[in-house]
Design a protein with these regions (language model features):
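Glycine-rich ThDP/TPP pyrophosphate-binding loop and its adjacent helix/strand module
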Residues: 4, 195-396
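Cofactor-binding active-site loop characterized by glycine-rich and histidine/acidic residues
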Residues: 108-111, 115-252, 268-275, 280-281, ...
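Conserved acidic/glycine
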Residues: 1-134, 329, 338, 343-468
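A generic structural signal for short, non-catalytic loop/turn and secondary-structure boundary residues
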Residues: 67-70, 96-98, 141-143, 182, ...
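A short, flexible beta-alpha/helix-coil linker loop
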Residues: 82-83, 155, 261-264
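A general structural signal for short secondary-structure junctions and capping/turn motifs
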Residues: 65-67, 138-141, 246-247, 310-313
């Protein structure tokens, strides 16, 4: 058969097919984790620099002076639990104890909510075990009115900023006390008055949103900065790169954080690019400052976030921070990590546990004891238990104490457009037919209303636990 492609190859100077005979076949590289279930964890690939060995650039330095450090790691706590090196933030013992307690409270909250999901009180939960320092120390380093655009494992920021635990539990249970009225997946909090932007289930969308908010803050001549968090898996999304481009071009006052906890659900971090270089090293490609941090070192996290926040507030531009850490639990209550990683990975993680490392540092300073640690753990567990008991008075999943069904169509338009009115009426009719036992006492709420009508009537219905 004649080679019909020969004229085309000749036109473009390409070699004839026969000339390629000695070339090896093309191959693809598929990343593989360092160990699998049943295997001994392998951390031989991990290079951990000594604490205090990385230089601390001036906050006003050119971005290029930070790039060498993106291949190293900001570390403050050494093997003897001492704070060493130029990144030591020199925090007073009382601040350290407050951070320790907030991290312990976050972990106790996670444990209680996890058990609640297993008991059927909520449909879903995600823990932050092993990553508490990133949220809590980060919150302590920021100003209270800086806007945070979080991912779903930053509950520690809300807790550090004093958001009521009961309100968080109401949202998780989607009960009648839920300020979001059951419209968000559990753990997708929203608290503008606490500088906490609504969590989205769409990965990485918060990155460009944070950059846009920071740009708006600068346009208004404000002094507040923005910060955002994504996992390393989400850094493979296009929104990550769009955010980096806008942040670099407009010198936006924003801190962009990548929490590299090694796993994106069951996907090894190599699928997001971890085998090639660090995630912090991407900063150089965009011409912005970059830092790589021991995410289990509370003092290092605080110091890095403070450095980047001060830089942004002084119009020094954006910073990309990678927190190197480990997701100690499953991705969520719907995940079984034993199906894809070694069960010993958590215990053998070389960077340890953030809560114990900070506690041991305080003990080394003579400012803490093991007995105080035990008592603190008891206190925070009781605090969470009391908040849970109070929230459960508003109902749990399937209990019946929830916002009326029809309210899902409210609070967007002042007057519902005709198409939503039709959809609402159809949904209510179908619900009555499919689940007649769920139809409570008839009331005027059986038809769609305006937002103003809905707010007044829903309050009355909620007091009875009725409604469609």
């Amino acid at each position: 058969m004649a080679d019909d492609t020969a004229p085309i190859r000749a036109m473009h100077g390409a070699p004839a097919a026969s000339a390629r005979g000695n070339l090896p076949p093309l191959e693809l590289h598929v990343p593989e984790p360092h160990s699998r279930p049943g295997e001994k964890p392998d951390y031989s690939w991990l290079e951990i620099p000594e604490a205090g060995s990385l230089a601390r650039p001036d906050e006003a330095c050119p971005a290029s002076e930070t790039w060498a450090g993106t291949l190293g790691m900001v570390r403050v706590l050494d093997e003897d639990n001492r704070a060493v090196g130029p990144w030591d933030p020199a925090l007073d013992p009382e601040t350290l104890r407050r951070m320790l307690r907030t991290m312990a409270l976050t972990r106790a909250f996670d444990d209680r909510m996890y058990r609640g999901q297993r008991q059927g009180k909520t449909s879903f939960y995600m823990k932050s075990t092993g990553e508490e320092a990133i949220s809590v120390a980060g919150a302590f380093a920021l100003a209270a009115d800086d806007m945070v655009f979080p991912s779903y494992r930053q509950q520690g920021i809300l807790i550090a900023r004093g958001y009521p635990l009961e309100e968080m539990i109401n949202q998780i249970y989607s009960n009648r006390g839920d300020r979001l009225k059951g419209r968000q997946l559990p753990i997708m909090y929203s608290a503008r008055d606490y500088g906490f932007f609504t969590i989205s289930g769409n990965l990485a969308t918060q990155f460009p949103q944070a950059v846009g908010w920071a740009m708006a803050s600068a346009i208004k001549g404000d002094t507040r900065i923005a910060t955002s968090f994504v996992g390393e898996g989400s850094s493979a999304e296009g929104d990550f790169h769009a955010a980096m481009t806008f942040a670099a071009v407009y010198n936006a006052p924003v801190v962009l954080n990548v929490v590299n906890n090694q796993w994106a659900i069951s996907s090894y971090s190599g699928f997001a690019g971890a085998e090639r270089t660090t995630f912090a090293a991407r900063a150089a490609g965009y011409g912005i400052a970059g830092l790589r941090v021991d995410g289990n070192d509370t003092l290092a996290v605080y110091a890095a976030m403070r450095w980047a926040a001060n830089r942004a507030r002084a119009n020094g531009g954006p910073t990309l921070i990678e927190y190197f850490t480990y997701r100690a639990e499953g991705h969520s209550t719907s995940d079984d990590p034993s199906a894809y990683r070694s069960a010993q990975e958590r215990e053998e993680w070389p960077l340890g546990d953030p809560i114990m490392r900070l506690a041991n540092h305080l003990i080394a300073l003579g400012e803490w004891s093991e007995e105080q640690q035990v008592e603190m753990d008891r206190e925070v567990a009781e605090e969470v238990r009391a908040a849970t008991k109070q929230a459960e008075r508003n109902g749990v999943l399937g209990h019946g104490f929830h916002h009326p069904f029809h309210t899902m169509f409210e609070d967007v338009f002042e007057e519902l457009p005709w198409n939503l009115e039709e959809q609402a009426a159809q949904a209510i009719r179908e619900r009555e037919i499919k689940w007649p036992e769920r139809v409570g006492q008839k009331h005027s709420g059986d038809k769609p209303r305006t937002s103003a009508q809905g707010s007044a009537e829903s309050a009355s219905e909620d007091s009875r636990g009725e409604g469609l």
